[in-house]
């Protein structure tokens, strides 16, 4: 007998009720899941074997150098980066094409000074309006770009709504999703187009930029390698948009995860001084009430920049305690001069902890359980640590593996400035220690910490001491050499307590979370990494954060195998 035609007995009423209840519960669970915000990464992986840099001479190739690894010479994994602003997912700002006003060129204007360190943080984000141009993919001759025209945006507007100020208009062709691959296959991403072996990536023409500029749109994005159509419209398109004060993402990816409207989109990147462009990290927030809240903050220009400007004039990296222990200083590397803009295109050679940066678990933890040949002194510290806090963990979680949602959340600022001046000079070098009692005192007045909150310790140290030479000793050198008190830092007991409270990210407006005592610092980082927590160090402007209603956003550049990560922190309120 064919089993599919067997007559089934009628259902019992209780069975019907049980199935109905189960279906209702399933529907409620699905609705609850839809109400939860979801973070989506839209950034390309930066790694030497990927086509992450512009392939033409003399643009520098990306490089990561593992300067120190955990072992006899170092208790930390320390990386140095050679990176320029045309690397991976990136940001373009007006001076890319707009000349400074004093040059009196045809394209001169005040926006010629709107470098990456001058853009207001509200402009980095907004409501994603995804213009679907997948029908243009590969629809052009070799070496030429299919053109996104005003009618493509008009088509979006007919289907959804008019674009406007506060929107981030994103051109989705799925180009990077299809062609960003390890080399040599990855030559198709840019190099094969320049060599006229393949069609170009879709991009807007100048008329499309004029259309958007007249709509009041100031932020764009594309999942193409550049916003400039090849072979001869790259500069006209750039200037057509940048003259309005636009900024945009180049090299976005994974735009298929976004609805046509309603999601919050943002790109954050290191705050390089005088940068006409910059490497960055793009992400979105989809679902629940959070996207609308963040969109409204950006639209109403309620944003605070928490990252200092990165400049070779400033002491952005640790000079170390002893000779030879300093980190790579932050250097600007010029490689191509533009006579029209009177500007050097440039990259940077820097330690991965320069300025505001991420501390992932792998910074202080070895990758596996193999015995680590620590220096004898450090072995003693490890024994002391494990007696009190349990076995030190291991981790392979480098920067690119840290979910963006780990470094975003409701802001909880704990003011610890009362600790400044609390140590005895005879005990220097020493940092005042933030204790569990300090955190609990905060909770009594401000309410209990909640899962997913971002705790920021306000010390005031970077704001007070970040100065160019010769006034630069107060930030690092004097405290490390015992000539001044160190900055307040959390001890490992606080890390354990915050983990129990559901905290994943701890931030500070001090140079680091470890302080000037190397033993205590290492224990803090061991505790942090062993509990799968992360740090964000070197903030500024924490005093400007409102006491309630502020949302913290930080994202590090998506560099593979990096044991720290430069990035940008902002607050939206």
Regions found by a protein language model. Give the residues of each.
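Cleavable N-terminal signal peptides
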Residues: 20-21, 32-33
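Active-/binding-site microenvironments in catalytic and ligand-binding cores
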Residues: 33-573
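Bacterial N-terminal signal peptides that target proteins for export
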Residues: 2-18
């Amino acid at each position: 007998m064919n089993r599919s035609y067997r007559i089934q007995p009628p259902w019992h009423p209780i069975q019907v009720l049980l199935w109905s209840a189960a279906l209702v519960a399933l529907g409620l669970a699905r609705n609850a899941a839809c109400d939860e915000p979801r973070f989506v990464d839209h950034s390309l992986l930066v790694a030497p074997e990927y086509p992450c840099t512009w392939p033409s001479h003399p643009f520098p190739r990306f490089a990561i150098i593992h300067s120190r690894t955990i072992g006899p010479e170092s208790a930390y994994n320390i990386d140095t980066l050679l990176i320029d602003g045309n690397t991976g997912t990136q940001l373009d700002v007006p001076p890319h094409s707009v000349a400074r006003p004093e040059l009196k060129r045809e394209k001169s204007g005040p926006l010629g000074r709107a470098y990456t360190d001058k853009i207001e943080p509200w402009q980095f984000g907004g409501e994603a309006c995804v213009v679907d141009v997948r029908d243009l993919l590969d629809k052009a001759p070799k070496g030429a770009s299919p053109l996104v025209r005003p009618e493509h945006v008009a088509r979006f507007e007919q289907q959804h709504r008019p674009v406007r100020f506060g929107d981030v208009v994103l051109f989705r062709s799925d180009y990077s999703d299809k062609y960003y691959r390890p080399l040599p296959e990855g030559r198709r991403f840019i190099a094969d187009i320049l060599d006229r072996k393949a069609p170009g990536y879709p991009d807007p023409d100048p008329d499309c930029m004029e259309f958007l500029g007249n709509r009041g749109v100031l932020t764009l994005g594309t999942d193409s390698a550049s916003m400039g159509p090849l072979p001869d419209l790259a500069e006209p398109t750039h200037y057509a948009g940048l003259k309005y004060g636009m900024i945009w993402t180049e090299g976005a990816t994974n735009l298929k995860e976004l609805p046509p409207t309603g999601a919050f989109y943002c790109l954050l990147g290191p705050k390089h001084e005088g940068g006409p462009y910059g490497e960055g990290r793009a992400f979105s927030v989809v679902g629940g009430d959070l996207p609308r809240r963040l969109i409204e903050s950006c639209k109403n220009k309620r944003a605070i920049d928490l990252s200092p400007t990165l400049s070779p004039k400033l002491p952005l990296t640790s000079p170390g305690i002893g000779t030879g222990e300093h980190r790579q200083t932050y250097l600007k590397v010029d490689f191509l001069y533009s006579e029209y803009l009177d500007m050097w295109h440039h990259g940077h050679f820097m330690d991965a902890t320069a300025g505001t940066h991420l501390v992932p678990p792998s910074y202080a933890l070895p990758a596996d359980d193999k015995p680590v040949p620590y220096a004898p002194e450090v072995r003693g510290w490890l024994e002391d640590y494990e007696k009190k806090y349990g076995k030190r963990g291991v981790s392979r979680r480098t920067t690119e593996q840290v979910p963006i949602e780990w470094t975003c959340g409701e802001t909880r600022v704990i003011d610890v400035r009362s600790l400044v001046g609390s140590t005895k000079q005879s005990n220097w070098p020493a940092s005042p220690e933030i204790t569990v009692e300090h955190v609990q005192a905060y909770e009594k007045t401000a309410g209990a910490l909640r899962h997913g909150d971002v705790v920021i310790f306000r010390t005031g140290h970077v704001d007070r001491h970040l100065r160019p030479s010769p006034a630069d000793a107060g930030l690092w050198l004097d405290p490390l050499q015992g000539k001044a008190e160190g900055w307040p830092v959390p001890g490992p007991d606080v890390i354990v307590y915050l983990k129990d409270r559901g905290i994943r990210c701890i931030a500070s407006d001090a140079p680091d979370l470890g302080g000037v005592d190397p033993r205590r610092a290492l224990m803090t980082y061991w505790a942090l990494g062993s509990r799968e927590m992360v740090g964000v160090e070197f903030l500024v402007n924490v005093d400007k954060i409102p006491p309630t209603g502020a949302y913290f956003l930080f994202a590090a550049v998506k560099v593979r195998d990096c044991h720290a990560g430069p990035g940008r922190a902002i607050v939206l309120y």
